[in-house]
């Protein structure tokens, strides 16, 4: 058995292929999804999507959204997504350092919230590169 995985952003289809298994970051933690998974709809957190193709694992940074799982089909609708292989490691690390600096100097609730979100997005991108398969 296999799963049909489709990852969509408002602007493009990031992934549309069959996979063996996925591990999805949700607002309540990570969930593993195998064929014949119970039907659910869940919020997707800023984090990593791990995709197993045969014996190889791929990663993708997801920027929040939601997912629908049912009938061996997984549809993930997110604000943005990047394959780990498409992320420039130096640029991602620089973005992370800038986000950390911005959080340290943030003042007021709004700035702190925005800086925290930017930091979480930057960490997800770095993690998508550094995940050991």
From Swiss-Prot:
One of its GO terms (molecular function) is ATP binding. SUPFAM superfamilies: Epsilon subunit of F1F0-ATP synthase N-terminal domain. It is a peripheral membrane protein. Keywords: ATP synthesis, CF(1), Chloroplast, Hydrogen ion transport, Ion transport, Membrane, Plastid, Thylakoid, Transport. It holds the Pfam family ATP-synt_DE_N. InterPro entries: ATP_synth_F1_dsu/esu (IPR001469), ATP_synth_F1_dsu/esu_N (IPR020546), ATP_synth_F1_esu_C (IPR020547), ATPsynth_dsu/esu_N (IPR036771). GO terms for cellular component: chloroplast thylakoid membrane; proton-transporting ATP synthase complex. Transmembrane segments: none annotated. Gene3D superfamilies: 6.10.140.480, F0F1 ATP synthase delta/epsilon subunit, N-terminal (2.60.15.10). It is found in: Plastid, Chloroplast thylakoid membrane. Produces ATP from ADP in the presence of a proton gradient across the membrane. This is ATP synthase epsilon chain, chloroplastic. It comes from Populus alba (White poplar). The gene is atpE.
